[in-house]
Structure formats: C-alpha cells, structure tokens
Amino acid sequence: MIQLYNSMTGKKEPFKPLEEGKVKMYVCGPTVYNYIHIGNARPAIVFDTVRRYFTYRGYDVKYVSNFTDVDDKIIRTANELGEDYHALTKRFIEAYHADTGALNVQKADIHPLVTETMDDIIAFIEVLVKKGNAYASSGDVYFRTRSFKDYGQLSQQSIDELRSGARIEVGEKKEDPLDFVLWKAAKPGEPAWTSPWGEGRPGWHIECSAMAKKYLGDTIDIHAGGQDLKFPHHENEIAQSEACNSQKFANYWMHNGFLNIENEKMSKSLGNFLTVHEAIQAVDPMVLRFFMLSVQYRHPINYSRDLIDQAANGLARIRESVANVEHRLTMTADLGTATEKWLNRIEEIKQHFVTSMDDDFNTANAVTDLFDLSKEANLYLGEDQVAKEVLERFLAVFQELSTVLGVTLTIEKGLLDEEVEQLIRDRDTARKERDFARADAIRDQLRDQGILLEDTAQGMRWKRG
C-alpha cells in the first residue's frame, strides 16, 4: 500500500482515495511572466513522478495544474516590455510547456487559466460574502480570517501568533490585519472584470480554490506544491474552500523541499538565478531530472556543478548497461538457457523499487534500485553464456522502472552496431595481415567512440563503456 507524508498531520499515512481506484490531484502551477527557474522545476518533476507512480499502481489519476495568467507581476512586466499581458502570458505558457516537456514532465489533464475561470471565481466569492466569511470594502473583497476557526492548522500557527506579526498596509481597508484579499478593485490601465463589487480582478489565493472546485469537486485527494506555498497560500486556500463548501478541502497535502544553488538560496541579487531554459542548454534535461529524483522530495536539494556531474556520470553508467544488454541480444551465437537465479534477482530489484516508491515516493531509494539493476546486468554480461530470456527481462524492467521515474535510458550511440562490427572485422583482417599500425588506429577509433574490446573463449566481444 502507498504511504505518503501528509503535511497537515505531519506523519506518513496510508493512501485511501475518495473513490476506489481514482486519484484527484491539484498542483499549484506558475505565474507566467518569465521562464521558470530550476526551483520551479522541482515540483513539476516531483509531482509528475507521483502521478506516474499512481498510474503504474493502477490508479486513474485526474491531474490539474493551473497557470496564473493575470497578477501584479504580469501586469508590471508587460508594461515594462510594452507588451499586451495576454501575449506575454501566452508566450511564457508555451515556454513552460517546452521546458517541462524537455524534462519529460507530462502535461496535466487540465491546465486552467485564471482569465478563463473568472465567472467561477466571482461565484465562489459571492458564496463567501453571503455566508459572512467575506466582506466588501470600497470595491475590494476580503476574507474574514477569524471566521474560520481552524485557520493556521496546516502551518501549525495560532491566530494569536499570526496576529502579532500582521499589519494593515496603506490603502487596505480591512476589518482585521489577518484578513486577506479575494477581489481587488480595478486600477487605471489594468485589466479588470465586472463583478457585484465593481470592476476588478481576483486575489491570488482564491484562484486555486475556485479552479480546484470547478475541475475536481469540493473535496480532493491530494493538493501539492512547493514548501514555500504552505503559508499563506495553501492555508488561505483551506480557509476559503472549507468556508465555502462546508467540507474538507483536501485529504492529503504534499510539499516538496527547497532547492539551493551552491548551498545558497537562489536570488537575482546573488547572481545565481538559473532558469530551466538556461540550464538545459548546458545539461542534458534527463540528467537534470535524474538529479532532482536522487533526493527524497521532502528534503532540501543543493544544485551544484559537482552534483550535476555526478548525476550525469551515474545516468551514463545506467545507459551504458542498457546499451550493452541491447547489443548482447544481437550476438545470438553465445545465447544459452535462462537460469532462475538471474530472473529472481531481477524480480527482487523490481519489488524493492515498488517498496521504495510505496514509502512516500522515495525516489532516492528508487534511483539506487536502478543502479542495482545496472550492476546486476553488468555482472550477467560477464557470464560466458547468457540467455535471451534474461536479457529481455533486464531490458523490460529497465524500461518499466525508468518510465515510472520519467527518465529515458536511450542514448545517442554514435557508431551503429553494424558499423562497429565492420570495424572489428577490418581490425581483425589488419592483424592477420600484420598491419599493426592500421589495427591500432582502428582500436583507437573504437575507444574514442566508447567501444571496449575483450577477447573471450567464444571470440572477440565488444561493449559500450
């Protein structure tokens, strides 16, 4: 059974879906005014992997992740660039899909936009006003935070603790410093929509509550996002949604840990701000994904050149194992009969992978399982005789596990197998003709392409190394 860490309770719990065999999952998406940075890539990769694993275990997953396509930062950036805000957000939504697509992140079943959900947002706020959980003030609408008795439960903060640090900013017309905005009155030159409270646009927090309700219902299985969203965003979502719907909003809350660069918080002021768009120009996107999955998702992760190089080398070793198994399958002359020992070992690793992922989606252990499979494949390839059934099983399980992790194990091979075979024949001919200079040149050419030659009792073998 899948166990996941619930941020609401602070402990691992068995996953029990609202509806047998189905998962309703909402993940907070980006505000689209720039390329996403590598910190944004972590939740995209993590929760894509969670989704993949649920699917692998037989669940039907409905996955919703929004785009905030109107807000203060978008409006400011559009004005600075002299660009229509619709054109700006459209451009960066396309960039988001391109960048996350390179990371093998599957598109959500639904990617709702705030600008296309405005009627639902307004209707949601109307219910809160009618119930007394929200109030209008000079064209703005605020949520009456003290009306929700469980406020602070997710972030484990009391109302009194929160009140001590709360302030009313200039221009705000709140009853209480703890209240937060649901609807902002229009400002000159900014996009606005007609509402019962006048022209305006929604606050940030209400958007996700309205979109989750529209596409997944009043109660969902899993709500997920980065650790930085726990407070105030997710806390406010809970208050709004449960006040509006009179039902529990989400049964499980999942939050991924922070990402630092070279042990420092990423920021433009430190000059270490790195977008995914920039990163994947220098690093194989699969290496970046593999790196992200090498650490358990709740733990902080440190992005550094050394750690990326380690991830690249590790992934290369696994890919080489796969390529060598594929190649050995073409060498039918020395294929023997299968032994239960090796088939059982492959199955043990697969089952351990499932155990790893059942334990709060522990991809760090799952990656280790992939290394173990690679190690066993290499040992098996060293046998004098290998069996087609075992080789095919190695490949099938490599494919199965890597698909769950979303990491592709195919590589650009350089020389094709038949080209390698021809060069080996040419080298053999040169040696027989005592043309050792040519034989050595061919050997060096093969070595430069990562081809290793070895003499065996069955003759010359080669592998990619």
From Swiss-Prot:
Q: What subunit structure does UniProt give?
A: Monomer.
Under the heading InterPro entries, the entry gives:
Cys-tRNA-ligase, Cys-tRNA-synt_Ia_DALR, Cys-tRNA/MSH_ligase, CysS_C, Rossmann-like_a/b/a_fold, tRNA-synt_1_cat_dom, tRNAsynth_Ia_anticodon-bd
Q: Where is this motif: 'HIGH' region?
A: 30-40
Q: Which cofactor does it need?
A: Zn(2+)
Per its UniProt record, what Gene3D superfamilies does this chain match? Answer: Cysteine-tRNA ligase, C-terminal anti-codon recognition domain (1.20.120.1910), HUPs (3.40.50.620)
- Copy out the cofactor comment: Binds 1 zinc ion per subunit.
CDD domains attached to this UniProt entry? CysRS_core
Reaction equation(s) it catalyzes: tRNA(Cys) + L-cysteine + ATP = L-cysteinyl-tRNA(Cys) + AMP + diphosphate
Q: Which organism is it from?
A: Exiguobacterium sibiricum (strain DSM 17290 / CCUG 55495 / CIP 109462 / JCM 13490 / 255-15)
UniProt name for this protein: Cysteine--tRNA ligase
Keyword terms of this UniProt record: Aminoacyl-tRNA synthetase, ATP-binding, Cytoplasm, Ligase, Metal-binding, Nucleotide-binding, Protein biosynthesis, Zinc
> What are the GO BP annotations of this UniProt entry?
cysteinyl-tRNA aminoacylation
Q: Where is this motif: 'KMSKS' region?
A: 265-269
For ATP, which residues are the binding ones?
K268
One GO CC term on file: cytosol
**Family the UniProt entry places it in:** Belongs to the class-I aminoacyl-tRNA synthetase family.
Keyword Repeat carried by entry: no
Instruction: Tell me its EC number(s), please.
Output: 6.1.1.16
GO function terms (MF aspect): ATP binding; cysteine-tRNA ligase activity; zinc ion binding
Sequence positions that bind Zn(2+): C28, C208, H233, E237
Localization in the cell: Cytoplasm
What domain of life? Answer: Bacteria
The gene that this protein is the product of is cysS
Is Ribonucleoprotein one of the keywords?
Answer: no
